[in-house]
Amino acid sequence: MKDVPGFLQQSQSSGPGQAAVWHRLEELYTKKLWHQLTLQVLDFVQDPCFAQGDGLIKLYENFISEFEHRVNPLSLVEIILHVVRQMTDPNVALSFLEKTREKVKSSDEAVILCKTAIGALKLNIGDLQVTKETIEDVEEMLSNLPGVTSVHSRFYDLSSKYYQTIGNHASYYKDALRFLGCVDIKDLPVSEQQERAFTLGLAGLLGDGVFNFGELLMHPVLESLRDTDRQWLIDTLYAFNSGNVERFQTLKTAWGQQPDLAANEAQLLRKIQLLCLMEMTFTRPANHRQLTFEEIARSAKITVNEVELLVMKALSVGLVKGSIDEVDKRVHMTWVQPRVLDLQQIKGMKDRLEFWCTDVKSMEMLVEHQAHDILT
């Protein structure tokens, strides 16, 4: 049995600046007000004053461990995550988290958060195989939770960092966007917003099978790059989203300075040419989606002889559906893969809808005027 009152009294005298906080902890502990005490401890461990040294480890050993069985499991893990940060030996931290996981197994969310923390430590020490297994395990558990919870953001932060480490651009792009969807952007420092926006933008451009940039373009995190020396990335993403090959080539003086993009220039050109074909299909009315080889060649900046190969590639990866008329050198499109639209593309849809409404109105008036002749 630990001398909890003695520890609290000693802490009050050793840190006069925080005496009131220690007194409050002692008061709540003595009165056995466990919920209020949990909230107070949560605030306590997040105070920057206690972030240095091993003060939180001592707090756990001499105080929290005495009543942790009365604490909400998820709150307990939240508290322990702050304690673990003061453990310099990762193996000690991992062992501590494993023991904690057993203590909170009554709560799926607490177990998920604990496993996510274990995965993050494994990633930090370079154990990629265990990190991968942890992510797969936790992902399955998350799918059984109702809605989005407080543990989702921590999981997507871990998974995106793992995919970034192994160079899987497409998976990083997907999970990094999911992370941003689970947090309030205002809670992230501007420097972190800029770094996340930059790595997300690069991953979107370089990721295999990533043809949907609308969600990133509409996310406020991208605005952190505006009017900075990385503004060119926003411009490049907009060029890709609209399939503007000419704009992409004009921006080469900027994106060509980024080593990863410069090394993958041919791949980037193929991707934006496919996006160009998608955009040409999307902007046409549904009843007029016949594209000539010349039109495609002109927009995609390729020769007429290369058009058929481009269309076949788009068909094979499921970006569009349609048929190729080699004799007349035309392509008839029947479907284009849905994407998150930017404001300009939404405006285009609005204009087409207004045109359709006008067309329907004209037909209505025609039928109204000619109804007598038709009926007789």
From Swiss-Prot:
Pfam families: PCI (PF01399), PSD13_N (PF22037)
InterPro entries: PCI_dom, PSD13_N, PSMD13, WH_DNA-bd_sf
GO molecular function: structural molecule activity
Keyword annotations: Proteasome
Statement: the UniProt record of this protein carries the keyword Isomerase: no
Functional summary from the UniProt entry: Component of the 26S proteasome, a multiprotein complex involved in the ATP-dependent degradation of ubiquitinated proteins. This complex plays a key role in the maintenance of protein homeostasis by removing misfolded or damaged proteins, which could impair cellular functions, and by removing proteins whose functions are no longer required. Therefore, the proteasome participates in numerous cellular processes, including cell cycle progression, apoptosis, or DNA damage repair.
Quaternary state and interactors: Component of the 19S proteasome regulatory particle complex. The 26S proteasome consists of a 20S core particle (CP) and two 19S regulatory subunits (RP). The regulatory particle is made of a lid composed of 9 subunits including PSMD13, a base containing 6 ATPases and few additional components.
The protein's name in its UniProt record: 26S proteasome non-ATPase regulatory subunit 13
Organism encoding this protein: Bos taurus
